[in-house]
C-alpha cells in the first residue's frame, strides 16, 4: 500500500485566482506586500519549537540533491505532524527536553538577559544557590533595619521632651511654649473633645 503525500496550505499562500486578467504593476506590488504580511502573521502564530524542528529537518537534508528537496518529505516519528496549540506546547517541550537532557535557563541580571543550556540537576543547584543568597540578603537587610528602628522605639519619648542641652535656653523655652500651644490646638480640634457644660 503506497502512502499518499498530502500538502496542506497552513500559511494560506496559495490563493485561488478567479480572474486571469493581467494586473497592473501597482496591484502586483500590493499583492506581494499583502502576501508577505500574511506570511509574517502566520509565522508569528506558529509555535517556535515547531519552526526550530522544521529548520533542523531541512538542515539535515542539505546534502541531498535539489530534486529531492522539491518533494515534501514524510514526517519522522519524533516530529509532531500537526502544529500543537500553545496550551499543549509545554507537554511536547517537556518530552523533547527529557530526551536532550538539557533545558534552557534564562537569567536576568543587572539589566542583561542570558540564556544557558544546562542539565536539570545543574539548573536546580543554580536555583538553590540563588534562593540561599537572596534569603541571606533579606536577613542581613532585616538586621540592619532592626538596628536602626529598635533604638528609636526603645526610647518612648515625645517630641520636645528631650530638649535640654541641644538648644540655647531662650530657644528651648520658646519651643516648649510652641509645642504646648500646638498640643492644645490639636486636642481642642479633635472630634471627641469634651465641650464644657
Curated annotation (Swiss-Prot):
Quaternary structure annotation from Swiss-Prot or TrEMBL: Homo- and heterodimer. Interacts with MYC2, MYC3, MYC4, AFPH2/NINJA, TIFY10A/JAZ1, TIFY10B/JAZ2, TIFY6B/JAZ3, TIFY6A/JAZ4, TIFY11B/JAZ6, TIFY5A/JAZ8, TIFY7/JAZ9, TIFY3A/JAZ11 and TIFY3B/JAZ12. Isoform 1 and isoform 2 interact with COI1. Isoform 3 does not interact with COI1. Interacts with RHD6 and RSL1.
PTM comment: Ubiquitinated. Targeted for degradation by the SCF(COI1) E3 ubiquitin ligase-proteasome pathway during jasmonate signaling.
Taxonomic path: Eukaryota, Viridiplantae, Streptophyta, Embryophyta, Tracheophyta
GO annotation terms (biological process): defense response; regulation of jasmonic acid mediated signaling pathway; regulation of systemic acquired resistance; response to jasmonic acid; response to wounding
Residue ranges with Polar residues bias: 57-73
Family according to the record: Belongs to the TIFY/JAZ family.
Short motif (Jas): ranges: 168-193
Domain Tify: 98-132
SMART domains tied to this protein: TIFY
Cited function: Repressor of jasmonate (JA) responses. Interacts with and suppresses RHD6 and RSL1 transcription factor activities to negatively regulate jasmonate-stimulated root hair development.
Keyword Signal set for record: no
A GO-annotated cellular component: nucleus
Domain of life per record: Eukaryota
Outcome following mutation: residue 109 to A: No effect on dimerization and interaction with TIFY11B/JAZ6
GO molecular function (one): protein homodimerization activity
Consequence recorded when altering residue 107 to A: Loss of dimerization, loss of interaction with TIFY11B/JAZ6 and strongly decreased interaction with AFPH2/NINJA
Induction statement: Up-regulated by jasmonate, wounding and herbivory.
Alphabetical UniProt keywords: Jasmonic acid signaling pathway, Nucleus, Plant defense, Transcription, Transcription regulation, Ubl conjugation
Entry text on domains: The tify domain is required for dimerization. The jas domain (168-193) is required for interaction with COI1.
Chain span(s) of sequence motif Nuclear localization signal: 170-177
Location relative to the cell: Nucleus
PROSITE patterns linked: TIFY
Annotated organism of origin: Arabidopsis thaliana
Positions of the UniProt region annotated as Disordered: 57-84
Protein name: Protein TIFY 9
Amino acid at each position: 500500500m503506497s502512502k499518499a503525500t498530502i500538502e496542506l496550505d497552513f500559511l494560506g499562500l496559495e490563493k485561488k485566482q478567479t480572474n486571469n486578467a493581467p494586473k497592473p504593476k501597482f496591484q502586483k506590488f500590493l499583492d506581494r506586500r499583502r502576501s508577505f504580511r500574511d506570511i509574517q502573521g502566520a509565522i508569528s502564530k506558529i509555535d517556535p519549537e515547531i519552526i526550530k524542528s522544521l529548520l533542523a529537518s531541512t538542515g539535515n537534508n542539505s546534502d541531498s540533491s535539489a530534486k529531492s528537496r522539491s518533494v515534501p518529505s514524510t514526517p519522522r516519528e519524533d516530529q509532531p505532524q500537526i502544529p500543537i496549540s500553545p496550551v499543549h506546547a509545554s507537554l511536547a517541550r517537556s518530552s523533547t527536553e527529557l530526551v536532550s537532557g538539557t533545558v534552557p535557563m534564562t537569567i536576568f541580571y543587572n539589566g542583561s538577559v542570558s540564556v544557558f543550556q544546562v542539565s536539570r540537576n545543574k539548573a536546580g543547584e543554580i536555583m538553590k544557590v540563588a534562593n540561599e543568597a537572596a534569603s541571606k540578603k533579606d536577613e542581613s537587610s532585616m538586621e540592619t533595619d532592626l538596628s536602626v528602628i529598635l533604638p528609636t522605639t526603645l526610647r518612648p519619648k515625645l517630641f520636645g521632651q528631650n530638649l535640654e542641652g541641644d538648644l540655647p535656653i531662650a530657644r528651648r523655652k520658646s519651643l516648649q511654649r510652641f509645642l504646648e500651644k500646638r498640643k492644645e490646638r490639636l486636642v481642642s480640634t479633635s472630634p471627641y473633645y469634651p465641650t464644657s457644660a
